[in-house]
Regions:
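Membrane-proximal, non-catalytic sensory/regulatory domains of signal-transducing membrane proteins
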Residues: 163-172
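Glycine-centered C-terminal helix-capping/turn motifs at helix ends
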Residues: 267-269
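Intrinsically disordered, low-complexity terminal regulatory regions
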Residues: 1-144, 148-161, 174, 183-257
């Protein structure tokens, strides 16, 4: 994967107005207040859907979320099952951690169940709001901690951005998060990559960065699949050899044993 340029983008302007719109959306959806006839929708549809799932499951925004770690025996199973994911992601996580060092954001890698399997970046363990979401084995699924970029990326299967009060719980409204799902060489979701800041300036452009990094991790997972032949695909006019390539792993008998998402988009029948 190519190096990641240190990120110094300017924070998004209009922060207080945006937070006010989110606050009105919370009152309307989470507390049932009637929206005015001229009120413009302040939420992405998938955020409102997530909020309503949380409400339907008995969660309430004023309650304290359960930042629990999975039991030791279950964690051992997660570690064994996700060893390849952690190894494939580590080089990208390390480069990403350096690239976002000056942004007050840090990186979290989870498995497909939303359990933290690795982290990187400037992580202040003295801040409990940081510590509870960066412990290896922390369960950050929607069922446990409500609407977050982690749960949303895993459910929606697409890159997402959430800012402050777009998270479900009042206690998680300090976070701003970008997330992207990770797909393995079998085409199934293997986990997700998250960038989180606490009381940080809104940077929705981080969704693009996390998506690029997720692509690199997916390619590393595919390249790690045993193969006798690796086929690279790209469109006319594109140069082969970068992270946009479609990757096909083929065994000695000519059977395809794995493919990255780009290859599956180019060849839908895979």
């Amino acid at each position: 994967m190519a190096s990641i340029t240190p990120f110094h983008g300017a924070p998004t302007t209009g922060g207080q107005d945006r937070l006010a719109r989110i606050g009105r959306a919370r009152q309307a959806v989470l507390y049932g207040e009637t929206r005015g006839p001229d009120a413009a929708p302040a939420l992405e549809g998938w955020i409102e859907s997530s909020w309503r799932r949380c409400l339907a499951s008995g969660q309430r925004p004023e309650h304290a979320p359960s930042f629990d770690t999975v039991p030791a025996a279950e964690m051992r199973r997660h570690q064994e099952a996700n060893q390849q994911l952690v190894q494939a992601a580590k080089p990208t996580l390390e480069r990403l951690g350096r690239a976002i060092a000056d942004t007050r954001y840090f990186a979290i890698l989870t498995n497909q169940a939303g359990v933290v399997v690795d982290v990187n970046g400037r992580i202040d363990r003295s801040d409990s709001r940081v510590d509870v979401i960066t412990r290896i084995g922390a369960d950050l699924s929607e069922q446990r901690v409500g609407t977050t970029a982690i749960g949303a990326a895993l459910i929606e299967r697409q890159p997402v951005w959430l800012h402050r009060g777009e998270h479900f719980f009042d206690a998680t409204s300090v976070y701003s998060c970008a997330g992207a799902p990770l797909f393995g060489p079998d085409g199934h979701c293997a986990g997700m990559l998250d960038l989180t800041g606490i009381e940080a300036a809104e940077r929705p452009e981080l969704k693009h960065l996390v998506t690029q990094c997720a692509r690199g991790i997916e390619n590393a997972l595919t390249l790690g699949r045993p193969h006798a032949l690796l086929i690279r695909l790209n469109w006319p006019g594109r140069t082969l050899g970068d992270d946009t390539d479609g990757l096909l792993c083929v065994d000695a008998d000519g059977r395809i044993t794995g493919a990255n998402p780009a290859a599956r988009q180019m060849i839908p029948r895979l």
